[in-house]
Amino acid sequence: MTGKDGAVLSESLNKSKSLCATENGGNNNPHLSKSSITHPPKCTGFGIQEILGLNKEPSSAPRSTLDSFPAGAHLLASRSMLGPAGVGVGVGMGLIGPGGIPSFYSQPAFLEVLSDAQNVHLQPLSRTVGPLEHNQSASSDSDDVSSSERKMSKSSLSQSKKRKKRRHRTIFTSYQLEELEKAFNEAHYPDVYAREMLAMKTELPEDRIQVWFQNRRAKWRKREKCWGRSSVMAEYGLYGAMVRHSIPLPVQDGFPTTSCFSKHEYPPFFAESILKSAKDGIMDSCAPWLLGMHKKSLETAGHQSNEKSDVTQTPTNPKPDEAEAEERRTESPMSKEELRENSIAALRAKAQEHSAKVLGTVSSERLEHNMETTATEEKSSEQIDAKEEEKSS
């Protein structure tokens, strides 16, 4: 602030000094008034209460009121104390002398003075400083808006870069779905070759086919869970396979039965139901691997029947000792503990026999090895003797 504003403030400060001198009772000693104004009371400690002046004792010298100073003086003094430049702002500009700043601004209890300053009217200073502050606030607001717009633009650009482009959902044709369903009925986990063949048939990328199979497997598992929690049976058992492919269940005594199903035993009426469903035209709903399971079961049943027939044709005559032991076991009822002890003894005897056999085989192998080594040594010694005789002759 320079020019007329500075002259007005200096005149107001001079008037305030003259008023202070008259209030002091016409004291001709100016040093006492300056010392009473400029020297603030010393702070006793560095605590929060001491800094804020909460525990401060009332000073002996009367504190000068705000009414004795003009509006511009205490405003500049408060700005110089609270601003980042400190006290030197007002002093360096020449508006306020080094002794012109009153003592209550430098005291720790400046909060009370600032609260009292709300009742003071600052009309003459607001008229002169108002346009400048308005321009400064407008410029600062515009700078803030521009900086915020720049930050928003940068953040939007970074977010647009980070966001991945969303892929459009593929729409399968009926032909593609038919081919995929056929492949899924043949194998739930197709290999690379099968996926390549499907890609050539359906003209779809291989990654899309892989994703379709993943989704189809998830859908199939969900269905199996809803159908009586038969996911395990649907994977390995016959009951789940029949439920999955809508094959009629076998009927006994007028009611469908499921007690005869297991992983390795296939009832005869299961084959009949499969063949009936195939003849009636439900072949499309029946998976080909189901018929493969039926064929394998028939083959295994044929092998087992052949083995049983061979065993019956060449019966082995049991030894008389074993027959007598069996008769004794059947005649004499034994408790569970006796049976357990006998079984443990039999196991121990078998273990001893096995260990003896192993030791016998090991000992025989050692003897054979020793015999071979002695034979090779004898042959080598004979060859050496023959060579020495030839040399001597």
Swiss-Prot record:
An annotated GO cellular component: nucleus
Compartments (UniProt record): Nucleus
Amino acid composition bias (Basic and acidic residues), ranges on this chain: 319-341, 365-393
Region (Disordered) residue spans: 18-41, 128-168, 300-393
Position of sequence motif OAR: 342-355
DNA-binding region: 165-224
GO molecular function, one term: sequence-specific DNA binding
SMART domains, per database record: HOX (SM00389)
Disruption phenotype: Morpholino knockdown causes a decrease in eye size and an increase in expression of vsx1 and ccnd1 at 24 hours post-fertilization.
Function text: Acts as a transcriptional regulator. Mediates the differentiation of V2a interneurons. Plays a role in eye development and organization of the neuroretina.
UniProt name for this protein: Visual system homeobox 2
Organism classification: Eukaryota, Metazoa, Chordata, Craniata, Vertebrata
The encoding gene: vsx2
